[in-house]
Amino acid sequence: MHGDTINIQDVILDLVPQPEIDLQCYEQLDYEQFDSSEEDETDNVRNQQARQAEQEACYRIEAECCVCNSIVQLAVLSSRQNVRAVEQLLMGDVSLVCHQCATY
């Protein structure tokens, strides 16, 4: 609006949505090995990438009930190595029981 009086021409009727700005910082720093040398920085980047690869993820495990042979599903949050260990256990001596068979 310009001036002391309101004019219809001064009123803006078209609203333009503002784009959302992501203010999240996705940077992760390793403070224990923080050093200004370039070699240490490249090592830190490699270590950080290795840590991110080993971070926990959500996995769904399906196995048969040892009593009624129905499918039992587990959702686990674990590293890839630990999921492999669970897989080896389920292929060996460990068996899962479904909810219905467990209540008898």
Swiss-Prot record:
GO terms for molecular function: DNA binding; DNA-binding transcription factor activity; protein domain specific binding; zinc ion binding. Its main location: host cell. One of its GO terms (cellular component) is host cell nucleus. Highly phosphorylated. One of its GO terms (biological process) is DNA-templated transcription. A zinc finger (unnamed) spans 65-101. It comes from the Viruses. A motif (Nuclear export signal) lies at residues 83-91. Residues 1-47 are annotated as: E7 terminal domain. A motif (LXCXE motif) lies at residues 23-27. InterPro entries: Papilloma_E7. The keyword Membrane does not apply. The keyword Transcription regulation applies. Keywords: Activator, DNA-binding, Early protein, G1/S host cell cycle checkpoint dysregulation by virus, Host cytoplasm, Host nucleus, Host-virus interaction, Inhibition of host innate immune response by virus, Inhibition of host interferon signaling pathway by virus, Interferon antiviral system evasion, Metal-binding, Modulation of host cell cycle by virus, Oncogene, Transcription, Transcription regulation, Viral immunoevasion, Zinc, Zinc-finger. It is found in: Host cytoplasm; Host nucleus. Homodimer. Homooligomer. Interacts with host RB1; this interaction induces dissociation of RB1-E2F1 complex thereby disrupting RB1 activity. Interacts with host EP300; this interaction represses EP300 transcriptional activity. Interacts with protein E2; this interaction inhibits E7 oncogenic activity. Interacts with host TMEM173/STING; this interaction impairs the ability of TMEM173/STING to sense cytosolic DNA and promote the production of type I interferon (IFN-alpha and IFN-beta). The E7 terminal domain is an intrinsically disordered domain, whose flexibility and conformational transitions confer target adaptability to the oncoprotein. It allows adaptation to a variety of protein targets and exposes the PEST degradation sequence that regulates its turnover in the cell. Plays a role in viral genome replication by driving entry of quiescent cells into the cell cycle. Stimulation of progression from G1 to S phase allows the virus to efficiently use the cellular DNA replicating machinery to achieve viral genome replication. E7 protein has both transforming and trans-activating activities. Induces the disassembly of the E2F1 transcription factor from RB1, with subsequent transcriptional activation of E2F1-regulated S-phase genes. Interferes with host histone deacetylation mediated by HDAC1 and HDAC2, leading to transcription activation. HAMAP family: PPV_E7. Belongs to the papillomaviridae E7 protein family. This is Protein E7. It comes from Human papillomavirus 69. The gene is E7.
